[in-house]
């Protein structure tokens, strides 16, 4: 379980001023992914969250499964409707204005002072998620914090619609 295995590293990395809450649905969520790369995504997002909360705060990471409609995937420029793993990373930091939010995935774009960041962390996050056929949704308001929602396609039978319920075929949850 990626989220459980990375929790000790994140706790150590974010320090004592930031409270970390990591949770996931009780049923395992299966995706086809490079675990090391997804851990890097979580480390980069946690690092940015820590920096956005210099006086401390709460960093929440939650895993779930969602059904994406054609309308949603079309409006977000993604390829397919269907069932996705959703990893939500939310902080209560200083947040971003719209002008900043629209540029955060550009390589070398940073709001950090010289010597504190390269501007590559979120560009890498974006690239890793795209490499896994996923997509990101970011919401942020100055003074209220930032939420990253990472959508990754589920593995196995969940990639196709559930069959019609008949005596011969019954749908089973993707996480079993």
Task: Indicate where each model-derived feature is located.
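Core catalytic ATP-binding domain of two-component histidine kinases
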Residues: 1-176
């Amino acid at each position: 379980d990626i989220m459980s295995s990375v929790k000790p590293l994140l706790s150590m990395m974010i320090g004592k001023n930031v409270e970390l809450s990591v949770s996931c649905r009780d049923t395992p969520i299966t995706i086809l992914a490079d675990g090391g790369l997804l851990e890097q995504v979580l480390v980069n997002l946690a690092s940015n969250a820590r920096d956005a909360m210099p006086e401390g705060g709460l960093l929440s990471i939650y895993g779930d499964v969602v059904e994406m409609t054609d309308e949603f995937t079309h409006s977000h420029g993604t390829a397919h409707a269907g069932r996705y793993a959703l990893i939500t990373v939310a902080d209560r930091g200083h947040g971003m204005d719209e002008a900043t939010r629209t540029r955060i995935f550009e390589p070398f774009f940073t709001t950090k002072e010289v010597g504190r960041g390269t501007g590559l962390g979120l560009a890498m996050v974006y690239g890793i998620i795209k490499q896994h056929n996923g997509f990101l949704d970011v919401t942020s308001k100055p003074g209220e914090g930032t939420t990253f929602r990472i959508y990754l396609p589920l593995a196995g039978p969940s990639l196709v619609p559930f069959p019609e319920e008949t005596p011969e075929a019954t749908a089973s949850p993707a996480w079993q």
